[in-house]
Structure formats: C-alpha cells, structure tokens
Amino acid sequence: MLTLRSGRMGVLMYYNEMYDGTNVREAYASLFEWVAQMPAEIRQMKQAEAEALFRRIGITFAVYGEGGDPDRLIPFDMMPRVFTQGEWRRLERGIKQRARALNAFLRDVYGRGEIVRAGRIPARLVYQNEAYEKAVVGFVPPRGVYSHIIGIDLVRTGRDEFFVLEDNCRTPSGVSYMLENREI
C-alpha cells in the first residue's frame, strides 16, 4: 500500500485529529469530555437517528454505474472536526488563494486562452470537457468571479499538514451537506 508520507509501499498512515498518540489534543478537550459522559449506546443511537433522518429527507448522493442503490448516504460522523484559530486562519488563506487561482483559470479559459496556447494544459482537456461551456467564451462576470462557491475537499495528514483531494466548481454539494450536518 502506498503511504502518504513516504511515497513508498508500506502501511497507509493516517492522522488522528483527536489524539496526539497519548493524550487528547487541547482543541478537542471539551468536546472529548462531553462525548465521554455519553454512554456508547446513546452515541450509536444518535448516529443511527442521524443516518435515518438523512435518508428520509433525501440527503444522499448519487453513484451511477456501480449497481445497487444509486442514492447513498453521505459519510457522516457525529464527531465534528475541530480546528484551532491558527489552523483555521491558515486554511482560510489557502482556500481563498485556491478560489482566486480557480477563477483566474476560468477567466483565462473563457478569455485569452493563454494556458492552453502555452501548452500548460492540452486543449482537448479543456475544450472537449463536458463541463466546458462555449456560451461563456468572452463573457466576463462581475469582478471576474466565475465560481462564487467552490467545494474544496481537504484531508489532514499531520499536525500542520493538509492536502486538497479535489476542487469542485460545478456543483459543490458538500456545502449543503455541511450546512445540513450542523442542523442534525
């Protein structure tokens, strides 16, 4: 198996956000205390209730072509991710930078096309992509913002280490899942 850190074959490494190997991380301390007071059967019941509610009100995503139920529940954990103020500031800077870069890419693709002409990206990957909209060529939206909401999927692999799994400018459904998760 490929490890994230070494790039070599071996055991897949993961990062435990709540524990530092010995103790509960400071950012998770109050959440841990609250959850620790809740009996395991209550936590399991609440998880099952949340999943049933998700299914009943249709908070699912479609996976076509794999057989079985195409409407699957989103992966949901009752335990929220906790970020320190410093972590959140760093993530915010990086996410804003990605949003600017993605909008600059779209501005170029639908405008001057320099990235394709320079050979940085093959033309077929852009112009033959099903998401490419010919009607947008030459259009400049207000403030040059083509995508107002961008879904950026993050994974944490270390204490100060985050990686982007994907950017979604078309239908960032994860935003709606996140908002609904807060309600449930």
Predicted segments with their positions:
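Preference for protein termini
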Residues: 1-184
